Design a protein with these regions (language model features):
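Active-site anion/phosphate-binding pocket segments in diverse small-molecule metabolic enzymes
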Residues: 7-12, 23, 73-275
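Active-site-proximal beta-alpha core segment in soluble small-molecule metabolic enzymes
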Residues: 1-103
Length: 275
């Protein structure tokens, strides 16, 4: 485990801990995102962090906050962040500080600002072969191949009559006799409740089906009236890495979020199968 030192005050508190050895850590530099990190031009405070005898400093890093944008002002801001970071690293080294491994770029930093070279690159979302959303800027186009699919199974199949309701709140009322199926995924697994009654599509046995009614904690219901062959245990695709209509980006867009949030919220109850 390697700790992040988020600022000078944090580093000072380390001195009060009863540690049996120096704390392995990386130092976070705030170059403009203003989330965590000691500000890049607070050189006196930064030097005190690096001279803290309780720290074993293995690296130094910052984070770009608009590297995925093609807006002129955002590109200029990112370039300024890079300039601030490089200047800070240079000054620390000139003062004799060992900054360790240096890293700045995450996925879009690596794609759009790859002329900058550091020791590490923190690849995140593009490891899944997807973009954060369909509007994300890529200066250097990558032919990304999605690798993640999300599946559930049919747990029940039944017929309902016209005017029957489905799930909590009776938000779906059948306008005709329908065939429906319950499937084994809900908002506790990362299928957000906000997608209830949004004409969300899933795929079962090669057929698209709509999610109907409110999404429950552990289950949801789909309309399978037009699916001729369906039975308990059949696989249902919520995300299909080989189907653009069931992409992670489209799922996230429908939930008014980004794929980073959606994928990070997939619950631990979901088995991970690597192939």
């Amino acid at each position: 485990m390697i700790q992040t030192i988020v600022d000078y005050n944090y580093s000072e508190k380390i001195k009060d801990l009863k540690l049996s050895q120096k704390l392995n850590c990386h130092i976070k530099i705030n170059t403009g995102m203003n989330r965590i990190g000691e500000r890049y031009d607070n050189m006196d405070r930064l030097i005190k962090i690096y001279e803290n005898p309780r720290l074993n400093i293995l690296g130094t890093f910052s984070h770009l906050c608009v590297a995925d944008s093609d807006k002129k002002e955002d590109i200029e801001f990112t370039e300024k962040q890079i300039e601030n970071f490089n200047k800070c690293i240079k000054q620390l080294k000139e003062n004799g500080q060992d900054v360790g491994k240096v890293h700045l770029q995450s996925s879009y930093g690596a794609i759009n600002y790859n002329t900058e070279t550091y020791d590490y690159v923190r690849i995140g979302i593009i490891m899944y072969g997807v973009n954060s959303d369909n509007t994300a800027y890529q200066k250097n186009k990558l032919d990304l191949k999605p690798v993640l699919s999300l599946k559930a199974r049919v747990t029940s199949v039944k017929e309902i009559n016209k005017d029957d309701s489905v799930s909590y709140g009776r938000t779906y009322i059948a306008d005709s006799n329908r065939k429906i199926a319950s499937i084994s995924i809900g908002y506790a697994d990362g299928f957000p409740r906000c997608l209830s009654n949004k004409n969300m599509l899933v795929k079962v046995n090669g057929n698209y089906s709509k999610v109907i009614g409110r999404i429950c904690m552990d289950q949801c219901v789909i309309d399978v009236t037009d699916v001729k062959e369906i039975k308990t245990g059949d696989v249902v695709y919520i995300i299909d890495c080989d189907d653009i209509n069931l992409s992670s980006e489209k799922f996230a867009m429908n939930a008014d979020t980004i794929t980073n949030e959606f994928l990070s919220r997939l619950g631990n109850r979901l088995p991970r199968i690597r192939s």
